[in-house]
C-alpha cells in the first residue's frame, strides 16, 4: 500500500505541475464559487438511491457531510504541488470512515460519477473561452479520478481488514467458553418457560410475560447467536420457531380468557413445551463441536478486548437502524486507579480490575457486550436498552463496585468507585461518534466529583 500511495502522489503531483497555472486558477475559482451548489445537488441526486439513503437519513450526518463535501471539492480542485501529500491522506481518512460505517464501495463510486456529471454544466456555463472550459474540465476530472482511485484503494484495504475481523470475531465467539454459554442459554429459555407455565397454572396475570423474542434468550439469539452460527441451517430453524411461537403468544395475550378453557390451556402449554424442547435440541447441536479459545479476549479480565469493537458496533448500529430498537453505550473509568496502583502495587491493581470486570458480567444481559477499552477504562454496549434501562444498568454497576470490599496487603480497606458516561445511539452511523459523546459524559461525571453516572445530552 505504501508503494501504491507513493506512485499516486507522483501522478497527482505530475498532473498539477503540468497544468497551466491559469487553468488551475480557474478550476479553483469554479470550486470556490460553486462548491455549495455542487454539494447540495450531489446529495440530492445520491439520496434518490434507496441504498444510499440508508446511510444519509440522519440529519446531523447530512449537515456534516454537505459541509465536508464542499471542503473536499475546493481542496481537490484547488490543489497545489505542496497539497498533494495532505490530499492523499484525506482520501485515506475518508475511506476509513466509509469502511467503518459500512458504506458499500458501489455507493462511493456512484457518488464520484454524480459529481463529475453535475460539474460538467457548471464549467461549461462559465464565461471562459471554449478552450479554457475544456482544459478546466479535463484538469478537474483527472483530479477527481485520482482522488477517487486513492480513496477506493484505501477503502478496499480498510473494508477487507474489517471483513477479516468480522470473520475472526465470529470464530472467536463460537469458540469462546462455548460449554458455559450453551448451559447459560438453555437455563435462560427454561427459566422463561417455567415463568409462563407457573403463571398459567396459578391463574396469575400474564401481562408481565414477554414473547420469546424479547426474553433474555431471544435477545441473545438475535444479537449474538444468529451471528455466531451464521450460515448453519439450525439458525433458520430456531428463528422460525421463535417467530411462530411469538405469533401464538401474542394471539393468546389478546384474549387470555381462552386459557380458562381446559383444552385450549393444555394446547398452549404443549406448544410452549414443544417449542422450548426443539430449540434446546437445536442449540445443543450448534454448540456440540465448539471448544474454548481465547484469541480476542483480554487475558487479565476475560473481557473482550477492543479488537472486535468495530465489528460489533457496525452490526449493532445496522440492527438498531433496521429495527428501530434502542442502542446505548457506557464508558467506565475506575476512579483514581493510577493512584491506587502506585500506592498498593500492580497485583492489587490487577485484582481491582478483575473484581470490577466481574461486576460488569453480573449486571448485564447475555445480549450485551463488555470490553476492556484501555488500562482502567471499559466499554459496555447495551442492546435494546431504553434510556431508563441504560441508566439503571449503569447505576447498578456503580453501586455494586462501590460496595465491593478489597483489602490491601497490610489489611487496610481500599475504597473503590466508578465514573460512568452513558450515551444513546441517535442515528449517526459512525460508532466513534457514539463513543465520543459517551466519553464527554464520562468527563462530566469526573468533573462533578466522580463515583456517579452521567447521561450525554446535547445541553451538556
From Swiss-Prot:
Mg(2+) binds at residues 333, 376. It catalyses: 2 GTP = 3',3'-c-di-GMP + 2 diphosphate. Binds 1 heme group per subunit. Binds 1 Mg(2+) ion per subunit. The record marks 60 as: Important for oxygen binding and stability of the Fe(II)-O(2) complex. The record marks 65 as: Critical for restricting water access to the heme distal side to avoid rapid autoxidation. Is composed of an N-terminal sensory globin-fold domain that binds heme and oxygen, and a C-terminal GGDEF diguanylate cyclase domain. Pathway: Purine metabolism; 3',5'-cyclic di-GMP biosynthesis. It comes from Shigella boydii serotype 4 (strain Sb227). The record marks 338 as: Transition state stabilizer. One of its GO terms (molecular function) is metal ion binding. It is an enzyme of class 2 (transferase). Residues 325-458 form the GGDEF domain. Keywords: GTP-binding, Heme, Iron, Magnesium, Metal-binding, Nucleotide-binding, Transferase. The record marks 43 as: Involved in oxygen binding and important for the stability of the Fe(II)-O(2) complex. The active site is at residue 376. CDD domains: GGDEF (cd01949), GS_EcDosC-like_GGDEF (cd14757). Heme binds at residue 98. This is Diguanylate cyclase DosC. Substrate binds at residues 341, 350. Its cofactor is heme; Mg(2+). GO terms for cellular component: plasma membrane.
Amino acid at each position: 500500500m505504501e508503494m501504491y500511495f507513493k506512485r499516486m502522489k507522483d501522478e497527482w503531483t505530475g498532473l498539477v505541475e503540468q497544468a497551466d497555472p491559469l487553468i488551475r486558477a480557474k478550476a479553483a475559482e469554479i470550486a470556490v464559487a460553486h462548491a455549495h451548489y455542487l454539494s447540495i445537488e450531489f446529495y440530492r441526486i445520491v439520496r434518490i438511491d434507496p441504498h444510499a439513503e440508508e446511510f444519509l437519513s440522519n440529519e446531523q450526518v447530512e449537515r456534516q457531510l454537505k459541509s465536508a463535501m464542499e471542503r473536499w471539492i475546493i481542496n481537490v480542485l484547488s490543489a497545489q504541488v505542496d497539497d498533494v501529500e495532505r490530499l492523499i491522506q484525506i482520501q485515506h481518512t475518508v475511506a476509513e470512515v466509509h469502511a467503518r460505517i459500512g458504506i458499500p464501495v458501489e455507493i462511493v463510486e456512484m457518488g464520484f460519477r454524480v459529481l463529475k456529471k453535475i460539474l460538467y454544466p457548471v464549467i461549461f456555463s462559465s464565461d471562459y473561452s471554449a478552450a479554457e472550459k475544456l482544459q478546466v474540465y479535463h484538469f478537474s476530472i483527472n483530479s477527481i479520478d485520482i482522488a477517487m482511485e486513492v480513496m477506493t484503494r484505501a477503502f478496499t484495504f480498510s473494508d477487507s481488514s474489517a471483513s477479516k475481523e468480522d470473520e475472526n470475531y465470529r470464530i472467536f465467539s463460537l469458540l469462546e467458553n462455548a460449554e458455559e454459554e450453551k448451559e447459560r442459554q438453555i437455563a435462560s429459555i427454561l427459566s422463561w418457560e417455567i415463568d409462563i407455565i407457573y403463571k398459567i397454572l396459578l391463574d396469575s396475570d400474564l401481562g408481565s410475560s414477554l414473547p420469546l423474542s424479547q426474553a433474555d434468550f431471544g435477545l441473545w439469539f438475535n444479537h449474538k447467536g444468529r451471528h455466531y452460527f451464521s450460515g448453519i441451517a439450525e439458525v433458520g430453524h430456531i428463528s422460525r420457531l421463535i417467530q411462530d411461537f411469538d405469533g401464538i403468544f401474542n394471539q393468546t395475550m389478546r384474549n387470555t380468557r381462552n386459557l380458562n378453557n381446559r383444552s385450549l390451556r393444555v394446547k398452549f402449554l404443549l406448544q410452549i413445551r414443544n417449542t422450548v424442547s426443539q430449540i434446546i435440541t437445536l442449540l445443543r447441536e450448534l454448540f456440540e463441536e465448539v471448544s474454548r479459545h481465547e484469541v480476542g479476549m483480554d487475558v487479565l479480565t476475560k473481557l473482550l478486548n477492543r479488537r472486535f469493537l468495530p465489528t460489533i458496533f457496525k452490526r449493532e448500529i445496522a440492527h438498531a437502524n433496521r429495527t428501530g430498537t434502542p442502542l446505548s453505550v457506557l464508558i467506565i473509568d475506575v476512579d483514581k486507579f493510577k493512584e491506587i496502583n502506585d500506592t498498593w502495587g500492580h497485583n492489587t491493581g490487577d485484582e481491582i480490575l478483575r473484581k470490577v470486570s466481574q461486576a460488569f458480567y453480573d449486571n448485564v444481559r447475555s445480549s450485551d457486550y463488555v470490553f476492556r477499552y484501555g488500562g482502567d477504562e471499559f466499554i459496555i454496549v447495551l442492546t435494546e436498552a431504553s434510556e431508563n434501562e441504560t441508566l439503571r444498568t449503569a447505576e447498578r454497576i456503580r453501586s455494586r463496585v462501590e460496595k465491593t470490599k478489597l483489602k490491601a496487603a497490610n489489611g487496610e480497606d481500599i475504597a473503590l468507585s466508578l465514573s460512568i458516561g452513558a450515551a444513546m445511539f441517535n442515528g449517526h452511523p459512525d460508532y466513534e461518534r457514539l463513543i465520543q459523546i459517551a466519553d464527554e459524559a464520562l468527563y462530566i461525571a469526573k468533573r462533578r466529583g466522580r463515583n456517579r453516572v452521567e447521561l450525554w445530552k446535547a445541553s451538556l
